[in-house]
C-alpha cells in the first residue's frame, strides 16, 4: 500500500502534537492533529499521534479507531502497531478495574487501576492519569487506606485542579482520619471554583459539620456516664460531679485550678441541660453542637407555637 509522506509543515505540526501529548496537554495535541487530518486525510502519522492523544484523554473508543486507521493506511507501521497494542491492553485493564469496583472487589480494582497506569505510561498531567488515580483513590478509600488515597487525590488535583472526584474522596479521607477542618478547607477551594454545584456544597457542609462536631464538649465524659444512661442516672451523676467541681470547694487553690473547676462546673450545667431534654439529647447524639442544638430547639418551639 502506498504510504503518503507528510509535508514538512504537517510533520512539524505532528511533532509539536507529540510533544504536547508528552506534557499531558492532550487537548492541544488532538486539535493540532485534527487540523492535519482535515488537510491530508491519508496522513498516517497524524492518525497515530491523534489516536495516542485520545487514549491518554480517556477516550479509548476514538483513540483506538484512529490507531486502527493508521494501521489500515500503513499495516507495517511499527509505531502505530506498538501504540495500538499498548493502548488496547490499557483499555482492557481499565475496564477490568471499573468492573471490579462496581462489584465491590476493591483490592482487585486497586490492582487493575495500578496496572492501567503502568501500561499507559501516561504523563502525570494527562487526563487519563488524573482520572485513573482518582478512581484508584476511591478504591483505596473503600479499603480504608486513607493516606494512600489522599496521595492519589493530590496527584489527580495536580493534573487537573478542578477534579471534583479527587476533592470529594480527599474530603472523606480527611474526615475518616479525624482531620475534618482540613477537609473543609480543601472543599472550600473547590466550592469557590463552582459555587453553584450542589454535590460540592453537600460535601463541604458535611466537612464543616464534622469540624464543629469534633470541637464539641464530650458531655457524656463530663458527666462520667455512658451514652445509654437514663435521665435519673444522668441527674445522679450531675449531682456527684457538681460536688466535686463546685467553685467553693476550690476557692483556696491556685488560679489555674480554680479556672479548671469553673470550666468543669459550667460544662456540667450545659451537659445536664442537653441530656435531660430528649430532643436536645437526640440532636447531640446525631452530632450537632450546642449552637446548632439551640437553633433547632428554638425552631421547634416557634413551630409548636404557630401550630397551637
Protein language model annotation of sequence segments:
Residues 6-7, 41, 75, 121, ...:
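Short coil turns that delineate tetratricopeptide repeat
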Residues 189-192, 196-271, 275, 296-299:
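N-terminal J-domain/J-like co-chaperone modules of DnaJ/Hsp40 proteins
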Residues 10-11, 44-45, 78-79, 90, ...:
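Helix-start (N-cap) detector for alpha-helical repeat units in TPR-like alpha-solenoids
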Amino acid at each position: 500500500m502506498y504510504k503518503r509522506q507528510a509535508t514538512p509543515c504537517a510533520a512539524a505540526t505532528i511533532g509539536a502534537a507529540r510533544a504536547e501529548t508528552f506534557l499531558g496537554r492532550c487537548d492541544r495535541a488532538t486539535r493540532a492533529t485534527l487540523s492535519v487530518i482535515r488537510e491530508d486525510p491519508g496522513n498516517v502519522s497524524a492518525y497515530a499521534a491523534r489516536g495516542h492523544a485520545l487514549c491518554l484523554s480517556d477516550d479509548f473508543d476514538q483513540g483506538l479507531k484512529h490507531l486502527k486507521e493508521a494501521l489500515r493506511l500503513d499495516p507495517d507501521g511499527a509505531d502505530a502497531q506498538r501504540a495500538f497494542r499498548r493502548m488496547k491492553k490499557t483499555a482492557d485493564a481499565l475496564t477490568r478495574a471499573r468492573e471490579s469496583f462496581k462489584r465491590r472487589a476493591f483490592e482487585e480494582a486497586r490492582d487493575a487501576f495500578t496496572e492501567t497506569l503502568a501500561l499507559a505510561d501516561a504523563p502525570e498531567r494527562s487526563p487519563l492519569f488524573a482520572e485513573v488515580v482518582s478512581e484508584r483513590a476511591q478504591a483505596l478509600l473503600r479499603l480504608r487506606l486513607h493516606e494512600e488515597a489522599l496521595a492519589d487525590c493530590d496527584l489527580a488535583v495536580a493534573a487537573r485542579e478542578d477534579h471534583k472526584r479527587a476533592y470529594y474522596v480527599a474530603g472523606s479521607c480527611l474526615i475518616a482520619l479525624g482531620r475534618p477542618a482540613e477537609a473543609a478547607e480543601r472543599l472550600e477551594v473547590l466550592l469557590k471554583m463552582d459555587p453553584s454545584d450542589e454535590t460540592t456544597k453537600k460535601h463541604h457542609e458535611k466537612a464543616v459539620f464534622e469540624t464543629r462536631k469534633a470541637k464539641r464538649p464530650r458531655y457524656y465524659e463530663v458527666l462520667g456516664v455512658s451514652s445509654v444512661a437514663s435521665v435519673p442516672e444522668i441527674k445522679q451523676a450531675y449531682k456527684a460531679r457538681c460536688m466535686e467541681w463546685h467553685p467553693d470547694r476550690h476557692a483556696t487553690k491556685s488560679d489555674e485550678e480554680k479556672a479548671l473547676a469553673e470550666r468543669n462546673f459550667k460544662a456540667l450545667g450545659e451537659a445536664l441541660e442537653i441530656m435531660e431534654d430528649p430532643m436536645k439529647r437526640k440532636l447531640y447524639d446525631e452530632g450537632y453542637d450546642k449552637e446548632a442544638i439551640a437553633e433547632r430547639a428554638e425552631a421547634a418551639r416557634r413551630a409548636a407555637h404557630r401550630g397551637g
